[in-house]
Amino acid sequence: MNALNIGRNDFSEIELAAIPYNILSEHYGDQAAREQLALEHEAYELGRQRFLKMLERQVKAGEFADNAAAKPLVLTLHPQLTKRIDDWKEEQANARGKKPRAYYPIKHGVASELAVSMGAEVLKEKRGVSSEAIALLTIKVVLGNAHRPLKGHNPAVSSQLGKALEDEARFGRIREQEAAYFKKNVADQLDKRVGHVYKKAFMQVVEADMISKGMLGGDNWASWKTDEQMHVGTKLLELLIEGTGLVEMTKNKMADGSDDVTSMQMVQLAPAFVELLSKRAGALAGISPMHQPCVVPPKPWVETVGGGYWSVGRRPLALVRTHSKKALRRYADVHMPEVYKAVNLAQNTPWKVNKKVLAVVNEIVNWKHCPVGDVPAIEREELPPRPDDIDTNEVARKAWRKEAAAVYRKDKARQSRRCRCEFMVAQANKFANHKAIWFPYNMDWRGRVYAVSMFNPQGNDMTKGSLTLAKGKPIGLDGFYWLKIHGANCAGVDKVPFPERIKFIEENEGNILASAADPLNNTWWTQQDSPFCFLAFCFEYAGVKHHGLNYNCSLPLAFDGSCSGIQHFSAMLRDSIGGRAVNLLPSDTVQDIYKIVADKVNEVLHQHAVNGSQTVVEQIADKETGEFHEKVTLGESVLAAQWLQYGVTRKVTKRSVMTLAYGSKESLVRQQVLEDTIQPAIDNGEGLMFTHPNQAAGYMAKLIWDAVTVTVVAAVEAMNWLKSAAKLLAAEVKDKKTKEVLRKRCAIHWVTPDGFPVWQEYRKQNQARLKLVFLGQANVKMTYNTGKDSEIDAHKQESGIAPNFVHSQDGSHLRMTVVHANEVYGIDSFALIHDSSGTIPADAGNLFKAVRETMVKTYEDNDVIADFYDQFADQLHESQLDKMPAVPAKGDLNLRDILESDFAFA
């Protein structure tokens, strides 16, 4: 075995950095300085361990080619091997005499005996696996085995290569010959299978079913013989060595240094490639830190690189998360003081671990039957009992396998969630005894603010419940009022007016106090919408009841936007209809746009159940065989009945409505309904009515799409206008006669109300995605890199503009809220999650006002649509001006009404 020799990274320059140590020591003392730099050092060491663990796991699984260390090498070698395979095919095609055993399988994807019997004309139609795919397959298989001592023998590698190519030829024909069927019925299910064995077993069942229906020409696969597989694999190894020099054949050495002629040849990476991969793996391991919270205030941001953490490190933080250093440099000279101030205020907020909640978390996450549904179980759910006649009863076997598959699918997600859960709990325990911790923040390229460490206040309910702000104030009467509102919100009682929320808390005071007194036995709190955040509320509520209104409370209370994307579109367009649906207007009741859409959907469902179309059953003839198979298209009446039986609530429509403002299309809504509602319902036994899941999802997607687009007409108009602008800017303008380029494709640029510049610049990759049936996918070079920027991707520019534009606006609003709340109301503790602003109860009333005041100021002082137009209009060619739709008209929404709306941010 020719293993990688990955040197140990020395991160001592982080822990021993003199300048940051002196600064920290002067301000926070020697111990804090040492601990902070030790944490930053540990972040790199933990990152290194994580990288190497992933590398080891991929090596053991034979997936080394998918590791970041190997991907550039695959990209480099792929065109070289592709050319060598093409050359060999041409050489053999032109050679006289009998073809080698490997020729027909490699050239045409069929066994030699079958190829000879086919005849030349028929054989021409058998294109086989492409040289590009064969090259990728060969590199992935060989790299996957070169590090595994029991798999690196030449015969073993050759055999695996031959089998892999046969599988690609055999099952790849399904994708090629029956593309529509594969995409609709096979692709997603194949991706859900983990491991080659399960994927192949699934595809064998698919193949048999298709052949029984007269598809694939009705022909069974003519298997390659074992020796033929060996010939194919050996030839591919030879071509790999000739074309790339990636591997070499070696034998074990005798004591005198000579080859052991009795041993089998080994396939080993050539020394030059071992060194190359080792260096790259070592470098990557050294720049993959697992960032953690700080035990001193983070380093303030004063420029675009180097804030947050105090040591420089191998990979200093950037203020803006961009795809390249070149993109980051654009921000270097930008004057945006409010942006810097907002991010610094966010990360200068001290937090601490909520020890009371953590004590409960430490116990409850290890219960076999945890009452909190979102806590991933310790063990896999038990498989359904196997039928006694499973070996002889085909119907019973299929039913059992379907139920078992659902268990395995859920368990895959459980394992991933469990790992994240255990990491978060470990981090909370690690920092539990610190009086204060801080979280460095930066932004994505649209200006949305993110915490950097994996453990942070923007996490799930358990993580948020396990953290609280470090600086509190006496809660007072007003703060106690907002604490009650927060408690009701955490319980899911957030779609009713404030008095009803207060009433819910007061009526359940006994349950709240009992939960606080003994949460492990009094588990009423686990039934609430956000159980851990609600438990944190219970402890604080009990504290106020015990100590009175002078109780020092630091629990963060959040004011969330009501479908913020549509709120921003409605405000910028003064749309009173959409604005009312998302609570921008004063009202005695809470407007729930998700329920509004659900109600409209239910109206149509009841109509369709009575007057809808009927199911159609067609006999479809196979184009090649002429055989018929049945196609069932469920009618509206049947689909409506299924959904009425299941029940369409706001939960079904929420994600689809929420993402409309972020550019989702009907096809995405269909996928969301399938993933969020139908598949989970089928898995837990509540979705048995969905006999045709894809049809049910498509039907519901159309109903939701139709309902939401008539509810927020102005938002849809704005999104379409933005797409038109992006499409024109991304278009290349040529002279019709001379074909001279009059205007190149342009990226899009705009500036948010608080001065943050946004560049949307999606470019086409000089690569293509090559996907194998079983061995995954990879980017492969289509052209050699010239060092110049690639062409603007017009499709991505158009589809991305609506979500990116509105995300930039809510990011700006959040930052402006932070600065305004600090400057006007003196608030200095912030809990921020995109469209949610929070602070301690004593300051909550002022933040309630601040978030509304900045929303009004944003759109009173800025016509963001007109400003956007002004920033790109000069870039349009004169021939495009008449193609640009007029700027959307404004409605009659009075922005000042937002100040009086209780529920706009609540």
Swiss-Prot record:
<dbReference type="Pfam" id="PF14700">
    <property type="entry name" value="RPOL_N"/>
</dbReference>
<keyword id="KW-0804">Transcription</keyword>
<keyword id="KW-1195">Viral transcription</keyword>
<dbReference type="GO" id="GO:0019083">
    <property type="term" value="P:viral transcription"/>
</dbReference>
<dbReference type="InterPro" id="IPR043502">
    <property type="entry name" value="DNA/RNA_pol_sf"/>
</dbReference>
<protein>
    <recommendedName>
        <fullName>DNA-directed RNA polymerase</fullName>
        <ecNumber>2.7.7.6</ecNumber>
    </recommendedName>
</protein>
<dbReference type="GO" id="GO:0003677">
    <property type="term" value="F:DNA binding"/>
</dbReference>
<dbReference type="InterPro" id="IPR024075">
    <property type="entry name" value="DNA-dir_RNA_pol_helix_hairp_sf"/>
</dbReference>
<feature type="active site">
    <location>
        <position position="560"/>
    </location>
</feature>
<dbReference type="InterPro" id="IPR046950">
    <property type="entry name" value="DNA-dir_Rpol_C_phage-type"/>
</dbReference>
<dbReference type="GO" id="GO:0006351">
    <property type="term" value="P:DNA-templated transcription"/>
</dbReference>
<comment type="similarity">
    <text>Belongs to the phage and mitochondrial RNA polymerase family.</text>
</comment>
<feature type="active site">
    <location>
        <position position="835"/>
    </location>
</feature>
<keyword id="KW-0548">Nucleotidyltransferase</keyword>
<dbReference type="InterPro" id="IPR037159">
    <property type="entry name" value="RNA_POL_N_sf"/>
</dbReference>
<dbReference type="Pfam" id="PF00940">
    <property type="entry name" value="RNA_pol"/>
</dbReference>
<dbReference type="GO" id="GO:0000428">
    <property type="term" value="C:DNA-directed RNA polymerase complex"/>
</dbReference>
<keyword id="KW-0240">DNA-directed RNA polymerase</keyword>
<comment type="function">
    <text>DNA-dependent RNA polymerase catalyzes the transcription of DNA into RNA using the four ribonucleoside triphosphates as substrates.</text>
</comment>
<keyword id="KW-0808">Transferase</keyword>
<dbReference type="InterPro" id="IPR002092">
    <property type="entry name" value="DNA-dir_Rpol_phage-type"/>
</dbReference>
<dbReference type="InterPro" id="IPR029262">
    <property type="entry name" value="RPOL_N"/>
</dbReference>
<feature type="active site">
    <location>
        <position position="654"/>
    </location>
</feature>
<dbReference type="GO" id="GO:0003899">
    <property type="term" value="F:DNA-directed RNA polymerase activity"/>
</dbReference>
